[in-house]
UniProtKB/Swiss-Prot annotation:
Its main location: secreted. GO terms for biological process: cell surface receptor protein tyrosine kinase signaling pathway; modulation of chemical synaptic transmission; negative regulation of neuron apoptotic process; nerve development; nerve growth factor signaling pathway; neuron projection morphogenesis. The gene is NTF3. The lineage of its organism: Eukaryota, Metazoa, Chordata, Craniata, Vertebrata. This is Neurotrophin-3. It comes from Charina bottae (Northern rubber boa). Belongs to the NGF-beta family. SUPFAM superfamilies: Cystine-knot cytokines.
Length: 163
């Protein structure tokens, strides 16, 4: 996943909820529980959701084997969702050209407008890779903790378009 620093606006909770609904409707949400076919006593086939424990066991097995899930994302879906700007990341069809520069260390917060204007001029704009909270590059993570404290899977690759 490529990410881009954005200065286009603040991401609201409503816009994020709308984006998540779109992802769910597109069938690409991470927590989609796999289904399996089972036969009842009378021989009829039924579709049964796997239990959460079975799904977790499969995910754990896949992680041990070095498998990282690959999700196909329609490029048009991402183009439609560009209005959901985030100050942190933007899904991009382009790969980053190089690792990002480290953020400039800025002077402590001062409550005066002049220094605020000075600080705003130091922002970096460009394509950024994912890094952890210790500010060192991480390229082999298969799971992470999101901003709400939930454990999530880090995708190794996202295929875009019809290929």
């Amino acid at each position: 996943i490529q990410s881009t620093s954005m200065d286009q606006g603040i991401l609201t909770e409503d816009s994020m909820n709308s984006f998540i609904r779109t992802l769910i409707q597109g069938g690409i949400w991470k927590n989609k529980v796999p289904k399996q076919t089972a036969r009842t006593k009378d021989g009829m086939q039924t579709t049964v959701k796997k239990t959460e424990a079975e799904a977790d066991a499969m995910a754990s097995k896949d992680t041990r084997l070095g498998f990282q899930p690959v999700v196909s994302v329609d490029a048009e879906l991402l183009r439609q969702q560009r209005r959901f700007s985030s100050p942190r990341v933007l899904l991009s069809e382009n790969t980053p050209l190089e690792p990002p520069p480290l953020y400039l260390t800025e002077e402590p917060m001062v409550l005066n407008r002049t220094s605020r204007r000075k600080r705003e001029g130091k922002s970096h704009r460009g394509e950024y890779s994912v890094c952890d909270s210790e500010s060192r590059w991480v390229t082999d993570k298969s799971s992470a903790v999101d901003i709400r404290g939930h454990q999530v899977t880090v995708l190794g690759e996202i295929r875009m378009g019809s290929s």
